[in-house]
């Protein structure tokens, strides 16, 4: 029995999980999350509220800011669905990282990288809230809502990440590597420390799990949000789910593994969300205007500049990577600034444009088919790009080898 438990611990709590299975699971859970809570899996809206609360603590009156009237400032992080869900994500991330002994304080020695993290995080936060959602609400959980704005945002994000890759490869963003004499010594794992951390992770996990179940006895929505947040946190940390790497890998190495996983997750989530919409849960539809396109461009560029998206910085910061704590701070700053600038930007970029719903434009069955058709086109495009990129890379290697062989 002990051997079986040890094998389970090694295979499922310490080793990384298969990203495809994890993202599909996230898509399925996000559909249930929508059905029970009436909202989608999203994080930057709550980050914007955190910024609003911080300003209020400093004496700034944000009660007449239109953006906060749209997203709502009622309650606290402990009484809002988004708030307790995000707390659950952090609890899940730290639990999973502790199980695998993957927690280590890793400071950022280069000031240039800190500036990148702050600016990139701020651009991503600003862009996400301009588009009314980040890689979750305007992509992973936005597309299953059948909102056209999510498609605008997704395409713009892809373009933004491509531009971000080109810019971050410039010499100005490179840091000098310091070479030290002698072979580097690998730090040995302390079995006692690893075991201690594993049980601390278990305490955090079960404490939040029990709290979730207790809250469910009084509020199904809040308790279920806590439970889903815990699951989301486990999934993104153990499978290292990062939308930045999904896009960046396409442009840098041609690898499409994570991008394909995300598409599969959306395909699964779409059917679940569609079912709940047909049962009467209202879809979350946002303005399909320039705000979604500009927001996507800024978000895509920002996450590459920063090195991580919203889900990425959350789990990496829980692993002790200080760089991503700066990214998170930048996110809050950028999203809060968008709330401040919304009244000037919204009339031109958002409010004069329709909230387009594929289910209303094409009917329930037609909208579902259009959404799936677009997802299949995305999958075909990603597979084609992967093969095209790798074919070009192999041709370059073959040409280089040929030149060396002939002495050119």
What are these regions (language model features)?
Residues 1-408:
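Membrane-interfacial helix-loop segments of redox and metal-homeostasis proteins
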């Amino acid at each position: 029995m002990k051997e079986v438990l040890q094998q389970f611990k090694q295979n499922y709590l310490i080793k990384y999980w298969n990203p495809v299975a994890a993202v599909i699971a996230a898509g399925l859970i996000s559909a249930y999350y929508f059905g029970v809570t009436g909202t989608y899996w999203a994080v930057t809206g709550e980050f914007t509220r955190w910024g609003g609360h911080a300003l209020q603590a400093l004496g700034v009156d944000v009660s007449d800011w239109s953006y906060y009237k749209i997203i709502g400032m009622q309650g606290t992080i402990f009484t809002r669905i988004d708030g307790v869900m995000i707390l659950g994500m952090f609890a899940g991330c730290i639990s999973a990282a502790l199980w695998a002994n993957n927690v280590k304080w890793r400071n950022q020695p280069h000031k240039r990288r800190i500036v990148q993290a702050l600016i990139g995080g701020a651009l991503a936060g600003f862009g996400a809230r301009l588009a009314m959602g980040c890689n979750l609400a305007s992509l992973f959980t936005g597309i299953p809502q059948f909102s056209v704005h999510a498609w605008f945002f997704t395409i713009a994000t892809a373009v933004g990440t491509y531009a971000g890759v080109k810019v971050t490869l410039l010499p100005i963003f490179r840091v000098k590597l310091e070479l030290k004499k002698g072979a580097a010594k690998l730090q040995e794992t302390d079995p006692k420390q690893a075991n201690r951390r594993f049980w601390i992770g278990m305490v955090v996990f079960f404490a939040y799990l029990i709290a979730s179940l207790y809250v469910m006895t009084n509020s199904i929505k809040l308790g279920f949000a806590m439970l889903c947040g815990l699951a989301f946190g486990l999934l993104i940390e153990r499978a290292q789910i990062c939308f930045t790497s999904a896009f960046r890998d396409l442009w840098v190495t041609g690898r499409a593994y994570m991008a394909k996983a995300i598409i599969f997750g959306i395909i699964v989530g779409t059917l679940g969300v569609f079912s709940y919409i047909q049962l009467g849960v209202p879809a979350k539809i946002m303005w399909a205007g320039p705000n979604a396109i500009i927001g996507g461009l800024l978000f895509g560029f920002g996450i590459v500049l920063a090195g991580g998206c919203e889900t990425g910085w959350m789990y990496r910061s829980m692993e002790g990577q200080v760089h991503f704590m700066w990214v998170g701070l930048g996110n809050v700053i950028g999203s809060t600034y968008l709330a401040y600038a919304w009244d000037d930007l919204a009339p031109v970029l958002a409010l004069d444009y329709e909230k387009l719903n594929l289910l209303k434009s094409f009917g329930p069955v037609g909208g579902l088919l259009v959404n799936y058709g677009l997802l299949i086109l995305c999958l075909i495009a990603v597979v084609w790009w992967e093969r095209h990129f790798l074919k070009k890379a192999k041709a370059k290697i073959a040409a280089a080898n040929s030149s060396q062989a002939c002495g050119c």
